[in-house]
Amino acid sequence: MADQLTEEQIAEFKEAFSLFDKDGDGTITTKELGTVMRSLGQNPTEAELQDMINEVDADGNGTIDFPEFLTMMARKMKDTDSEEEIREAFRVFDKDGNGYISAAELRHVMTNLGEKLTDEEVDEMIREADIDGDGQVNYEEF
């Protein structure tokens, strides 16, 4: 996971990590974790912090070393990216911005992508994703 980070990102994380590793022993306490992440533009909730710490802090001693920290940050960034990518993709389909993808909007985008679909195929795609049966696809269904 951490191998997907650029050298620049790793250097950035190392710098931030060092700022909070007061005694220079290569570990930070769980209390410092939130401060470190916020300094890097992340905005974790208390619950997220606790979950991350529980996942990373294998021995439960309340400290995290740099390799553990890198793994955690890589995971956090990946989650953020994919959520944002899904949102952007939804906006591409939701032409009128009303929060729903209609059959007409789906047909329009698929045609622009070079996919000539029959009305039946479009309706079938909508039906497969349309959990609440309103004939459209909302963000959650998407």
Swiss-Prot record:
Q: Which UniProt keywords apply?
A: Acetylation, Calcium, Metal-binding, Methylation, Repeat
Matching InterPro entries = CALM/Myosin/TropC-like (IPR050230), EF-hand-dom_pair (IPR011992), EF_Hand_1_Ca_BS (IPR018247), EF_hand_dom (IPR002048)
Q: Which residues bind Ca(2+) 3?
A: 94, 96, 98, 100, 105
* Residue sites binding Ca(2+) 1 per the record: 21, 23, 25, 27, 32
Residue stretches making up the EF-hand domain: 8-43, 44-79, 81-116, 117-142
Pfam families documented for this protein: EF-hand_7
In-chain residues carrying the UniProt-annotated modification N-acetylalanine? 2
Q: What else does UniProt say about it?
A: This protein has four functional calcium-binding sites.
**Role:** Calmodulin mediates the control of a large number of enzymes, ion channels and other proteins by Ca(2+). Among the enzymes to be stimulated by the calmodulin-Ca(2+) complex are a number of protein kinases and phosphatases.
Name of protein: Calmodulin-alpha
Organism for this UniProt entry: Arbacia punctulata (Punctuate sea urchin)
